[in-house]
Every structure is written in structure tokens, then in C-alpha cells.
Amino acid sequence: MVEYSPGGGWYSQILARIPANGGSYTALVTSAKAAEGVRQMLASKGASGAVATVDPATGASTVPANSQDVVLTFRNVHNLTMAGGQSAANVFKSWYTMLKPGGTLGIVDHRLPASADTARERESGYLKVATVRQLAEQAGFKLAGSSEVNANPKDTADYPKGVWTLPPTYAAGDADRAKYAAIGESDRMTLRFVKPR
């Protein structure tokens, strides 16, 4: 199993323990500097696993082709799209390459309503489901399912400081903090794609 860009390790501390019965956990990051930070984070959480890299500029990865059953990413695709260029497309292609045929790509990210102006994806931290589907399908994936487990109908996705206005970040500081706390964390898409056999 690969987790792309594990950040502070909230999911990693759980995921790194799952493949104990003969499987493996690999954290996938975009630089050697990030790799060292992830190694330290995993150790601090009592978790273990390999750390690999992917270059968003090229899609080249240290994870072998056709070697993984699952790739997961939590709230990271918006960062790839906001980076511009081919970063998102290249990383999606790398995920496709590292997965075995029949393997699963799981994505959770902040959801922009389908009716919203697509230009808002550039800076808000929100993405349309259609944008994520297009990236995945262009890399060769097929949509296999979705879930509303991370849905939040209170989130209107139209805040002055984007998704970071909401908890836990509260980018607006104390301004309207109670209002944003009542909304809660972002509305999120939860998508499952497969690499065809």
C-alpha cells in the first residue's frame, strides 16, 4: 500500500499497521527532504514503512511498476492541481504505473460544487469531482465507486480564504470563527478508481 503525501501522519499511523500480514506500507513524497521528515514522523508515531519519492515534474518514482495493490491520497490532489503545469497529470500517471492491474486508487479531497466556476479550483483548495475524474481517467483509471461518508452539506465552498477558512485551519483567525466552527470541516469527495486488468 502507498500513501501519497502523508503530511502530519494522521492516516499514516493507522495505515502503516494494516499490512502487517505480509504486506507493506510506503509513504510517497515529492523530495528527499520530505522523505526525511516522513521517516521522523513515522518513528514518532510508532509506525514503520518504506519512504519513496515521485517527481511531479516528470512522474518518475522510486516505487517499482506494477508492485502495489492500493494507492491512497487524502486532501492532496488540490495541491497538485494548484501547482500548475503537468504536476497532477504526472503524479496520477505514476500512481497508475505503480499499481498492479486491478489495483485501487482511493482519493479524498475538498469538493467544489459542480455548478461552481471552475476557475475557483486554482486557489480555493476545492476541486470538482469531474476534474479529479478527468485526471484519473486520462491516466488510465476507471471510476469504480464513490461514497458520501465525508460529505458536509453545510459547506458552501465559497469562503474568502478558501477551504482553509474552515476548521481546523481557521485562516481568517477569530473573524467569524463560531460561524465556521458550526459549518465544520470541508465537504469532501471520496472516490475509488481501479487500474483495469
Descriptions of predicted regions:
Residues S61-L72:
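A short acidic, Gly/Pro-enriched loop at the edge of an enzyme's catalytic core
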Residues D176-R197:
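C-terminal lobe and adjacent flexible extensions of AdoMet/dcAdoMet transferase-like proteins
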